[in-house]
Amino acid sequence: LDLEQFGKSLFIDGEIQVATSDEHLYSSTFVGSGLNLNRENERAAIIGGGDGGVARECISKKFNFIDWYELDPEVVEVCNKHLGDIGKKSTEKNSVKCVWGDAFESIKTVNEDTYDHIFVDLNDDQFCIDLAAKNMDSLVRILKPDGVITAQVGSQDKKPKQVDNWLNVFNKNFGNATL
């Protein structure tokens, strides 16, 4: 949909996922906040992020290798076709390897200590929190010792319970999670 206030927008199951008017703020902040904690940018993993904005930002930050785990290639195709400025055809870049299917199944075969950064760009609903919590051991296993996991946790003012749930998941595994 092309919304007057937000520009071209993607809706899935009646929920807005991304809008061209403010996507850059989201993706640049999302990737940049992790880089403020760890400047290493050799390898990144993206879990979700079908619109391509996080992949675009990882490319712009000169990550050498980006593994993008996305469940639904159709979402990426639709975004490339209708919201092309967001992902800038990130799937066609040599530094990006797309792994289609269940990300949490796919990462089970990844070597330990592989990624400097893991960007978890899933929906901000309880299902995704539970899914990430169930698979946090796998995420921690593939993260380098000084690596950083950055997650889309939702809005503190609109979904405070979900934000608290995410913080509990991270504090249980790391003990040092902050907003």
Predicted features and spans:
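Short, isolated positions in well-ordered beta-strands
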Residues: 17-18
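A short glycine/small-residue-enriched secondary-structure motif
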Residues: 9-10, 27
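The AdoMet/dcAdoMet-binding core of the Class I SAM-like
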Residues: 21-173
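Conserved S-adenosyl-L-methionine
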Residues: 175-179
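Short strand-turn-strand beta-turns centered on an Asx-Gly dipeptide
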Residues: 12-14
